Regions:
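Residue-level marker for isolated small/hydroxyl-bearing positions within beta-strands
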Residues: 54, 62, 102-104, 149-151, ...
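Loop/turn residues immediately N-terminal
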Residues: 66-67, 105-108, 340-342
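Hydrophobic membrane-insertion alpha-helices, especially the h-region
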Residues: 6-20
């Protein structure tokens, strides 16, 4: 009997192995909605976790695996290291001649030298605990205050440090900081939308079947967003803010950016609302692969302040393990795949040859 079961067990083990490896070896031939195309721009970028434009031709890339910030010329594929020796960099912001760098547990400010290198580093914040997750993207509000995304140390727990599972505000000069929003399990990125406010992604707990969905949230200063009390029976705990958008559980919604009105990619007109695009890494926590896609999120304003609804659709799929994305000044979309050595893709309207 055992001899007959061995081939079946071996097949199941093989299928599970293929399932785990699939996202890391896929993504080179993504699918996209009709009328648009995806093209490979560059390879061997390490473990890309952020994309920031220095200008129209040079893209700065956080390489988590290499512990560095790389400058990539998207026209020639020439590249150079602007800063190395970092511990898992996940975020970068260019602001007033300085580079604000987010790495695991630490936020630092560097002067940008005439040759573009990052020099004379100053630690703004340090000592943020890391565990299951770490500190992620850093962005900025119109008043100059930084927004720093800080992940939880665990799947579900009560954090010992209130700076975990939170969005933090940080003074870009002094490093003074505090909690801007709590109950945010693992928010990777966010984007400021003029005349509206800050929208951010968040990824819920694992190992609970179809609960909870990944989220798009609207930031209200001082608000709580539910974790770790968001049980299946109370998905939006009393006193917490509900998400404005929900997506497939355990798929990891990460980088997010605002579609410019001049972009050729589909989206709402200003009179209708606005459109965000986000990268969905994909799940290791499901039997079958889910995620591995780029989403279009149409956002509509309600009649009440801070009241938003969304319509979310897949735009690119079979995309491997995308993490960061950003719109180019010309309106085309760029995203990077974390697995497979790190690849950069661009998305634009298909060339009809006319």
């Amino acid at each position: 009997m055992r001899r007959h079961l061995l081939p079946v067990v071996s097949l199941l083990v093989l299928l599970l192995l293929v399932r785990q490896l699939y996202p890391y070896v896929s993504g080179s031939d993504p699918s996209i909605v009709d009328g648009y195309e995806v093209n490979l721009v560059s390879e061997n970028l390490g473990g890309p976790t952020c994309l920031v434009w220095a200008n129209d031709t040079h893209l700065l890339v956080c390489d988590r695996d290499g512990g560095r910030i790389t400058e990539l010329n998207i026209e020639t594929d020439a590249r150079r290291t602007l800063l190395d020796g970092l511990h898992h960099p996940h975020g970068l912001l260019l602001h007033e001649g300085k580079a604000i760098v987010s790495e695991q547990g630490q936020l630092s400010s560097y002067l940008i030298a005439e040759d573009g290198l990052f020099v004379e580093g100053q630690t703004l914040v340090s000592g943020i605990p890391a565990g299951n997750h770490q500190t992620n993207s850093v962005n900025i509000m119109p008043n100059g205050t930084l927004i720093w995304h800080s992940g939880s140390t665990c799947n579900v727990c009560d954090e010992a440090d209130e700076r975990n599972a939170a969005l933090l505000w940080v003074n870009a000069t002094t490093g003074e900081h505090g909690v801007l929003a709590s109950g945010v399990r693992n928010s990777f990125d966010g984007v400021w939308v003029e005349d509206h406010g800050y929208f951010f992604t968040d990824n819920g707990r694992d190992w609970e079947g179809d609960h909870p969905p990944e989220e798009l949230n609207f930031l209200i200063a001082g608000a709580a967003y539910g974790w770790p009390d968001d049980e299946p029976e109370t998905p939006v705990p009393e006193g917490s803010e509900a998400p404005v958008g929900r997506w497939t559980p355990h798929t990891s919604m990460n980088g997010v950016d605002l579609r410019p009105v001049h972009s050729s990619l589909p989206g709402l007109s200003p009179s209708e609302g606005f459109t965000l695009y986000t990268a969905v890494y994909g799940s290791w926590n499901t039997l079958l692969p889910k995620g591995h896609e780029i989403l279009r999120i149409d956002v509509f304003s309600g009649e009440e302040p801070n009241d938003y609804t969304t319509d979310i659709t897949r735009f690119v799929w079979d995309a491997g393990t995308p993490v960061p994305l950003t719109f180019h000044p010309d309106g085309s979309l760029y995203y990077a795949v974390f697995g497979g050595g790190g690849k950069l893709f661009t998305v634009d309207a298909a060339d009809t040859g006319e």
